[in-house]
Amino acid sequence: MKKIIFIALLCAQLGHAQDSPSGLAGKHNEVRVDLLSLVALSKYNLSYERYLGEDWSLGLSVNYANNKRVNDDFDEGNRNTIPKYEITPFVRYKLSKSLSRFYFAEVFASANGGDFREITRFNENNVGYYDIEKSDYFDVAIGAGAGYKMYIKEQFAIELLVGFGVNTIDTDKSPDVFSRVGLSFGYRF
């Protein structure tokens, strides 16, 4: 009887040991920093992605920008909008068979906002004059993108992403087109 119990426990232990996959298949979480946006636009971008299986993943990207050069252009009238923040949930589908190098397609929604300026004509006592009004905007964009991702040593990620969306709510103040472009470096665990 003791031998049967011992063999049953041994088989159960061996069966349990084979349930946890190794390598990339066993790592379901990833964090990334977009260095292209940081260097080119002084925009901070941090992303988290959760792999649901071999082909699908969900993620959230958070951006914040407060660049002195862009703010000066805005104050001098060279641009009408400044995107300040973006919160972007996304869903991705892997288009390639490989786990370590693959193309992907994504759909996303983005809550984004920033500053808006416009020249407005006022009329007081039959005297017209123009003044600059500054206000905030908030909008929601929907869009799609595509990219390429590769892993080094099954944990360090390099990702290239290009995507575009359309703002849908406050189209008078917000930019018409919303872009997601980046070169990100991350860690999968």
Regions found by a protein language model. Name each.
Residues 1-25:
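Cleavable N-terminal export/targeting peptides
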Residues 15-18, 31, 105, 183:
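A broad, low-specificity signal marking well-ordered, structured residues that form hydrophobic/aromatic
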Residues 177-189:
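Outer-membrane beta-barrel "beta-signal"
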Residues 50-145, 150-159:
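Gram-negative (and chloroplast) outer-membrane scaffold detector with strong preference
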Residues 161-164:
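Internal, hydrophobic beta-strand segments that form the core of beta-sheet-rich folds
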Residues 24-26, 37-41, 78-84, 133-141, ...:
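Transmembrane beta-barrel outer-membrane domains
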Residues 168-169:
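Membrane-helix boundary connector in multi-pass membrane proteins
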Residues 18-71, 82, 188:
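Short glycine/proline- and aromatic-enriched beta-strand/turn motifs that initiate or cap beta-hairpins
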